[in-house]
Amino acid sequence: KEKWGYVDLYKDDLLEDKDFYFVHAVNRAPMLLNKKLFIEHLEHIDFSFAPFHCDDCELCLRAWLYGLKVGWYNAGFKSMVAGGMRIWNKGLMGFQEIKNRGKLYEMYKSSLEEITGLVTEANKTL
């Protein structure tokens, strides 16, 4: 099962009691970005994922490949099923999710091992 964007699938004993650890990707709600690093290294959000399913994962995976890190902090965010785009986009949501996950896989399938290694090494520093 894919773990990009799904923090509860990280069940590593070394991370179990931590409020922060490095992950492949985080969900944009909430997502904090360093503006200077974003502009210097990432430059843009990939709007080809519109209406905005997986663009957050794509940004995070790209960040790892550009030498940046992606961390997860327990901010108390609980729901990924209510509000936001889900209110107005119910008809396209399932289709767009499947389409964009396939696109994300094609974009990063050759980099998965590299990114996973970077995440693993970053977590060893905690």
Task: Please place each PLM-identified region on the residue numbering.
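Mature extracytoplasmic/periplasmic domains
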Residues: 80-90
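Catalytic core of nucleotide-sugar-dependent glycosyltransferases
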Residues: 75, 90-121
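Donor nucleotide-sugar recognition loop
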Residues: 24-28, 35, 39-79
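Catalytic cores of nucleotide-sugar-dependent glycosyltransferases that transfer UDP/GDP/TDP-activated
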Residues: 1, 31-32, 45-47, 116-118
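Intrinsically disordered, low-complexity regulatory regions of eukaryotic regulatory proteins
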Residues: 6, 53-56, 95
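A recurrent flexible, glycine/aromatic-enriched loop bordering the glycosyltransferase active site
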Residues: 2-3, 9-36, 52
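Non-catalytic N-terminal targeting/anchoring module and adjacent flexible stem/linker
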Residues: 53, 124-126
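Intrinsically disordered, low-complexity peptide-like regions
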Residues: 6, 15-17, 87, 98, ...
